Amino acid sequence: MTGGPIASWRTAAQGHLTPDENGDLKTDYSRWRLLDDRGRQTWHYLESDEENEKWPQSVADKHFLGLPTVTPLAPAATNRMFAIHELPELPKAKTPLQCAENGLEFFSKLQLPPGNWACEYGGPMFLLPGLIITYYVTNTPIPPEYATEIKRYLFARQHPEDGGWGLHIEAHSSVFGTCMNYVALRLIGVSEDDPRMIKARGLLHKFGGAIYGPHWAKFWLSVLGVMEWECVNPVPPELWLLPDWVPFTPWRWWIHIRQVFLPMSYLWSKKFTHPLDPLTKQLRQELYTQPYDSISFANHRNSIHAADNYYPKTWLLNLINQLLVSVWNPYFRIPALVKRAEEWTWELIRMEDENTDYAGLGPVSNPMNMVACYLHDGPDSYSVRRHRERLNDYMWMKNEGMLMNGTNGVQVWDTAFITQAIVVAGFADDPKWRPMLTKALEFLEDHQLRENVPDQEKCYRQHRKGAWPFSNKTQGYTVSDCTAEGLRSTIQLQEMHNYPRLISVERLKDSVDCLLLMQNPSGGFTEYETTRGSEKLEWLNAAEVFGGIMIGYDYPECTTASVTALSLFSRFYPDYRADEIKAAKDKAVKYIKRVQRPDGSWYGSWGICFTYAAMFALESLASVGETYETSEYARRGCEFLLSKQKEDGGWGESYLSSEKHVYVQHEKSQVVQTAWACLALMEAEYPHKEPLQKAMKLLMSRQQPNGEWLQESIEGVFNQSCMISYPNYKFYWPIRALGLYSRKFGNEELM
């Protein structure tokens, strides 16, 4: 049996392919379309001319693909990654409010029919390889347009200096990134003799070969059949049989690591391996520095290169792994116990798939679930077919090619913040923007979670009735700050600006009920569910490339968002659970003050980094009456930000802040972080205009003639070490900051 081939074109579409600047084949970008079906976003390549004519490209399609949005009068820019999209030029903004309106004029063109906005959610460089390996081992033909554009994207993200790939698009090369992306390229048909592959292979060998990859790399390579399972540290499904009261049982772990461990443990127990074929036989020769048969894989379970070892395994975890290998597996892992563990693990996989209609929590666990379904249900089963369809929800097309998003989108998150930006900037009552905001409200209404999942306790899910998810209701996981921002956006439109009451008061109360259930005894809020275990579980962190992943931690951003939303709710509904809301806010504010550092900063876990957290923290303190003039905490937060302002008036923070846990200046000011810092200072009622005025001038100077801002450095982060893109941030945060400045200081002429 061989792996999944690249599918054939349905028509003569191969004739659409043309060489790109690197000599790689490229599809005809005028044939790509994004379909947004009630928040489910999938890309489609129209092979026939008839299809192409019936479904014209939208402005949003062209923007995402880096195409000009009207016929350019001048030759198109050669570097489409940073090129200006040729919407008509707008009158040059002279005031902050004009600049905000020009930005909104551009950004409004990108709203999709259901009312949401879309974007890539890229950055991590380990997602596509898991997908490609899944396609291969489940004999799933890869659509030819996917293969063509995935190849282009991976080569576009190869480091030109050393030929490798990193954990994310701005990271240094590592074994994880280099090995996995090399394998992905080989599986989609790239020759080992391609000069770029030779360079990548040379770097991998310099690192010591694939045996020096982290745990997740070794897992995927073993599934593919190019590494032996003896090289993978144990992932026993028996842990799922432990009573719930045990302090280290998996239900206590952070949701993402739990959902990855689930199918990983099932496949590890089954020792599923794709049968050897000519290509995987070749890969066995290419990935190592010595003959495959001479490698003692069992001796390399703990081998890892320093470039990958962000969070080294503890002595305790190494001891546990050794005991599992030497004692548990050979002497105590009896067949009856294994059968029970595999059956229960499979039941949990099945519930996750059914609760999300096979969309899954995220792009790491979902391909693993598909392999588990392939093994358990068979290649032609409904579960495998549905997974194949749902994996398309994670794919994204851009000018560089096709990537895999970090979730199945950012729909609710972006739409809520865009709504708030327009309100804060003062545009919500303008009849021009009312249809757009009404559509956004319709989208938020559609994606509020109206009921809990079946068997909630059995599958360890958090209460979700009344919540909003990060992406869409199909994925359907409660997220505390998404719930807070959805609640806040709804109240702003319905209560403050008389938009249609699409979401009833009872449903707003459901949202508040959900938020109150998510607070931890510490006063803080996690993102997906309350904290279920001790921080000591971090001693069992086996991922090596990520930190802070074993439990759901309190996050300043989630806590502050919840405080701000609850404060707004109580303004309009002061009698609903008033004492409980006050108590929750009091505890949360104490947490926010407690985690402020001596220098006045807060560490942000979902955006870069101290700038991001300061914006949320200072706004939440202001919502309870603590501002620059009245609160030492707010004052110190403002002074910290002011100490980081650059000469040009902007702020720029490197992603290294997230890794190193100290503020690291970016070499350039960044539009997004400048907006964050300004919003933080203005919400805290910082009284001096001069620093803010300088920042406004920078934001205005970076705006393009059509109203957009260009992509700069990466904006988001997760697990301390992996960065992720939020490209819509460069639109709505500056719009919000510019509009708020004009409201606070007057719409003065600055340019």
Curated annotation (Swiss-Prot):
PROSITE patterns registered for this protein in UniProt: TERPENE_SYNTHASES
SUPFAM superfamilies: Terpenoid cyclases/Protein prenyltransferases (SSF48239)
Function statement: Lanosterol synthase; part of the third module of ergosterol biosynthesis pathway that includes the late steps of the pathway. ERG7A and ERG7B catalyze the cyclization of (S)-2,3 oxidosqualene to lanosterol, a reaction that forms the sterol core. The third module or late pathway involves the ergosterol synthesis itself through consecutive reactions that mainly occur in the endoplasmic reticulum (ER) membrane. Firstly, the squalene synthase erg9 catalyzes the condensation of 2 farnesyl pyrophosphate moieties to form squalene, which is the precursor of all steroids.
Keyword Lipid biosynthesis: yes
Active site (record annotation): 481 (proton donor)
Domain of life, source organism: Eukaryota
Gene name of this polypeptide: erg7A
Keyword flag Transmembrane helix: no
Protein name per UniProt: Lanosterol synthase erg7A
Pathway: Steroid metabolism; ergosterol biosynthesis
Any one GO BP annotation for this protein: ergosterol biosynthetic process
PFTB repeat ranges, renumbered to this chain: 147-189, 508-553, 585-625, 634-675
Subcellular location: Lipid droplet; Endoplasmic reticulum membrane
Membrane topology: Peripheral membrane protein
GO molecular function: lanosterol synthase activity
Misc: In Aspergillus, the biosynthesis pathway of the sterol precursors leading to the prevalent sterol ergosterol differs from yeast. The ring system of lanosterol in S.cerevisiae is firstly demethylised in three enzymatic steps leading to the intermediate zymosterol and secondly a methyl group is added to zymosterol by the sterol 24-C-methyltransferase to form fecosterol. In Aspergillus, lanosterol is firstly transmethylated by the sterol 24-C-methyltransferase leading to the intermediate eburicol and secondly demethylated in three steps to form fecosterol.
Region (Disordered): 1-22
Protein family according to the UniProt entry: Belongs to the terpene cyclase/mutase family.
Entry GO terms, CC: endoplasmic reticulum membrane; lipid droplet
Lineage: Eukaryota, Fungi, Dikarya, Ascomycota, Pezizomycotina
Enzyme Commission no: 5.4.99.7
Catalysed transformations (reactions): (S)-2,3-epoxysqualene = lanosterol
